[in-house]
């Protein structure tokens, strides 16, 4: 039953306190009817006895305490879902933003989703090809995984996000694949970049986009990733599609949480973020996965900018605890002109060994991955030594490793944002680079694989 009250007690920032209420639930949707007839929407953030704290999506400016009324709608924020969402652009609250018609929903779903029973989860073990060598070969993404990208302010993470959205696919052509893209608190220029890129490259045809701009209300920023994940779960578990969810920028999401927490006068945690930041992020990231008996899957790539490039900042720190690895972009590689500037050594995909090998990628995947890691690490060490002691201090084998590291960065990692490599092309390129080294140095690869794949004459 919808209830209406005229008992607004206080307005503070985006928050409004309503008293003498009954039967109100956490996260229930509300409508505020103002004295001029305007209607604004909001959400219940807290309930104590007969008092409710609500946040207004459009802000509280102009609300008159005596002449405004509040209606509690009896349900949480919902998203109307349908397969017709594919190819469309929505705002952070799921309203069409592309001048297209309203979606005719098949059903309405609570954006908070439902917890996946751990027993019902299926283990992620199928390869997703992004077309980016540093990810596909060395930090493999598998269906159902959550693999974040840790970037820094000014680094090209938006170009990387667009590239993954364009290029990502599953190798089995019979499987339906879709991308759900959530832009959180981005600038107007960034929004234009994403929409233009998706339209020009045709990526929009298999994508659902949710765009929340920096000047939109903070509460909408909280809702945007939940809208995206609700759409993804519908496409995955009810329509049998493999869905990749890209969310950028999760730092803006955490800042919105901090803003709301401060308005509620909560006791702050580390660096002013609320003490529940970890559990709140987990409610998003744990919605990735596969369910036994269902065909579809939800894979997540959340992208965040590390304030001051600090990996120990609460946002990347807590994200790392919840997710299954990280892809790290570095300023050093970016300044060297490497695009995308992925530093493969500190990057990690904890599930990479589950989605590789014969029948998934190729039999030589794991061995060449380990050898490339070892050779690049040794090459970087040799280059650092040459800076300190001079190149003449290097042994002959160290000079080879230093050249290997240089070629690895310039040819393997530096593929640009519009080159789409298949996993076969990436593996072959890895062998071409490993052929620089004496065969005796390739100790992490079995002889039968060396005989089969190492280029002639090595």
Swiss-Prot record:
Induction: By increasing intracellular Na(+) concentration. SUPFAM superfamilies: C-terminal domain of alpha and beta subunits of F1 ATP synthase, P-loop containing nucleoside triphosphate hydrolases. Keywords: Ion transport, Sodium, Sodium transport, Transport. InterPro entries: ATP-synt_VA_C (IPR055190), ATPase_a/bsu_AS (IPR020003), ATPase_F1/V1/A1_a/bsu_N (IPR004100), ATPase_F1/V1/A1_a/bsu_nucl-bd (IPR000194), P-loop_NTPase (IPR027417), V-ATPase_su_B/beta (IPR022879). One of its GO terms (biological process) is sodium ion transport. HAMAP family: ATP_synth_B_arch (MF_00310). This is V-type sodium ATPase subunit B.
């Amino acid at each position: 039953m919808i209830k209406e009250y005229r008992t607004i007690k206080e307005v503070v920032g985006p928050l409004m306190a309503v008293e003498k209420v009954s039967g109100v639930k956490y996260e229930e949707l509300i409508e505020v009817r103002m004295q001029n007839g305007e209607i604004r929407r909001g959400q219940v953030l807290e309930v104590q006895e007969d008092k409710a704290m609500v946040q207004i999506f459009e802000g509280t400016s102009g609300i008159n305490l005596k002449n405004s009324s509040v209606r509690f709608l009896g349900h949480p924020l919902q998203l109307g879902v349908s397969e017709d969402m594919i190819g469309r652009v929505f705002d952070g609250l799921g309203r069409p933003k592309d001048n297209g018609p309203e979606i005719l929903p098949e059903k309405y779903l609570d954006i908070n989703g439902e917890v996946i029973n751990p027993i019902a989860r299926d283990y992620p073990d199928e390869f997703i090809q992004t077309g980016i060598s540093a990810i596909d070969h060395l930090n493999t993404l598998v269906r159902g995984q959550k693999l974040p990208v840790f970037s820094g302010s000014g680094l090209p993470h938006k170009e990387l996000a667009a590239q993954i959205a364009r290029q990502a696919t599953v190798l089995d052509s019979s499987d339906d694949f879709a991308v759900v893209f959530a832009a959180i608190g981005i600038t107007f220029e960034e929004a234009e970049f994403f929409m233009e890129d998706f339209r020009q490259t045709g990526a929009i045809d298999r994508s659902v986009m949710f765009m929340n701009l920096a000047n939109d209300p903070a509460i909408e920023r909280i809702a945007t990733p939940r809208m995206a994940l609700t759409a993804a779960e519908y496409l995955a578990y009810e329509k049998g599609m493999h869905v990749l969810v890209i969310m950028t920028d999760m730092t803006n999401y955490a800042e919105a949480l901090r803003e709301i927490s401060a308005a509620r006068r909560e006791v702050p945690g580390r660096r002013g973020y609320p003490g529940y930041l970890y559990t709140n992020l987990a409610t998003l990231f744990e919605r990735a996965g596969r369910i036994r008996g269902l065909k579809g899957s939800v894979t997540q790539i959340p992208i965040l900018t590390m304030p001051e490039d600090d990996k120990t900042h609460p946002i990347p720190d807590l994200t790392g605890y919840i997710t299954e690895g990280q892809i790290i972009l570095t300023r050093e590689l970016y300044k060297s002109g490497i695009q995308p500037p992925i530093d493969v050594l500190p990057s990690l995909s904890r599930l990479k060994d589950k989605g590789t090998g014969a029948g998934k990628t190729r039999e030589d995947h794991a061995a060449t991955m380990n050898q490339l890691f070892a050779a690049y690490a040794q090459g970087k060490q040799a280059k650092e030594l040459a800076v300190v002691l001079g190149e003449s201090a290097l042994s002959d084998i160290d000079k080879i490793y230093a050249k290997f590291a240089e070629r690895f960065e310039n040819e393997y990692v530096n593929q640009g944002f519009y080159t789409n490599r298949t996993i076969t092309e990436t593996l072959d390129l890895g062998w071409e680079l490993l052929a620089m080294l004496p065969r005796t140095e390739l100790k992490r690869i079995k002889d039968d694989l060396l005989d089969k794949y190492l280029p002639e004459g090595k």
